[in-house]
């Protein structure tokens, strides 16, 4: 039995299939951990969502910002839904949309396997959160998403504020938790997220740190695997294993085997990108735009590679 974590799919169905073939995925005995952002940008979001849904008995999914955006779109009126990009529109108009979206809404913000020694999230954790605290806060939002009032949560999750504070209540608290789990890259030592900084470490504004390198952060008792930050490439440092290697931007799609003493990395080439990368959008209201986010992903060979002794950090695609 093998356990594989897989980076952001972002609607790249054909590439996902190639990666599953390359790792010789056997649903009878293997398990897949998907790091979130199953959909958007890749042009095959419906096919990708159907594929992961079909593997639901053999996989674990954590929600990314694009997955939450899809859920919010699905909860809107038909008139509003028709204004979204064609890739996501195909999902909300599909005959099996209810089955797909209801299943997606039941997925986690954080997955923990203490026997295996791993936690999976999409983006990041607050500097002072232990893994136990992260689980607790994830469950708070998951219960809302899975309950009858989920539409109100999806309407109220947008925005950059407030920053995390243990005393937050209501939708402010839920929004802060969602932002940490699904949008985090850089933050201050107090855990304030910087949403405008998306490049490689060293390009951020003064006073900001990658969330996994913040001074004074707590020691965590589990290894962490995550996606979201494609500009990093394959990065393994401080007990964090970032595996979004920019498949949708022309990089690679990465699988990381979690159940071996020596971590094994398998990659396949990502989507061919011939024109400018589309504008990246976080889960905000449609009128708000974010800056461009591009990456070549990991520049290493697209095969089975050992984890580098020194973290490999890639630069964004120009």
Curated annotation (Swiss-Prot):
Family annotation (SUPFAM superfamilies): Metallo-dependent phosphatases (SSF56300)
Record-listed E.C. numbers: 3.6.1.41
Role this protein plays: Hydrolyzes diadenosine 5',5'''-P1,P4-tetraphosphate to yield ADP.
Record bears the keyword Hydrolase: yes
UniProt source species: Xanthomonas oryzae pv. oryzae (strain KACC10331 / KXO85)
GO molecular function: bis(5'-nucleosyl)-tetraphosphatase (symmetrical) activity
Region listing for Disordered, in residue ranges: 269-318
Keyword Hydrolase among record annotations: yes
Keyword terms of this UniProt record: Hydrolase
Catalysis performed (reactions): P(1),P(4)-bis(5'-adenosyl) tetraphosphate + H2O = 2 ADP + 2 H(+)
Family to which this protein belongs: Belongs to the Ap4A hydrolase family.
Name this protein carries in UniProt: Bis(5'-nucleosyl)-tetraphosphatase, symmetrical
Biased composition (Basic residues): 282-297
